[in-house]
């Protein structure tokens, strides 16, 4: 799959699960962001729990919100 241009991918750990499939994620650099699950992960019923290691995509326009695109096994 080709990489998207202009997005920042960074690893993090899920700190808490919020309503509506939103999660608070602490990034590897110490920042905390609000993230939602990507559509493909929703389609395939991939569960995300607190303490899971994930990859988050951030937009350069708003670095406080992101999209969870991968959960490490």
From Swiss-Prot:
Residue ranges crossing the lipid bilayer per the database entry: none
GO molecular function annotation: ribosome binding; rRNA binding; translation initiation factor activity
Record's keyword terms, sorted: Cytoplasm, Initiation factor, Protein biosynthesis, RNA-binding, rRNA-binding
Keyword 4Fe-4S: no
Top-level lineage group: Bacteria
InterPro entries: NA-bd_OB-fold, RNA-binding_domain_S1_IF1, S1_domain, TIF_IF1
Keyword Kinase: no
SMART domains for this protein: S1
Pfam families: eIF-1a (PF01176)
CDD domains listed in its UniProt record: S1_IF1
Localization per Swiss-Prot or TrEMBL: Cytoplasm
Domain S1-like: 1-73
GO cellular component terms, A-Z: cytosol
Subunit and partners: Component of the 30S ribosomal translation pre-initiation complex which assembles on the 30S ribosome in the order IF-2 and IF-3, IF-1 and N-formylmethionyl-tRNA(fMet); mRNA recruitment can occur at any time during PIC assembly.
Entry function: One of the essential components for the initiation of protein synthesis. Stabilizes the binding of IF-2 and IF-3 on the 30S subunit to which N-formylmethionyl-tRNA(fMet) subsequently binds. Helps modulate mRNA selection, yielding the 30S pre-initiation complex (PIC). Upon addition of the 50S ribosomal subunit IF-1, IF-2 and IF-3 are released leaving the mature 70S translation initiation complex.
Entry's family note: Belongs to the IF-1 family.
Official protein name in the record: Translation initiation factor IF-1
Species this chain originates from: Nocardioides sp. (strain ATCC BAA-499 / JS614)
Gene from which this protein is expressed: infA
């Amino acid at each position: 799959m080709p990489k998207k241009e202009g997005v920042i991918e960074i690893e993090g750990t899920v700190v808490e699960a919020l309503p509506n499939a939103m999660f608070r994620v602490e990034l590897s650099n110490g920042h905390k962001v609000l993230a939602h699950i990507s559509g493909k992960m929703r389609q395939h019923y991939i569960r995300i729990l607190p303490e899971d290691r994930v990859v988050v995509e951030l937009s350069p326009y708003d670095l406080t919100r992101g999209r969870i695109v991968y959960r490490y096994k």
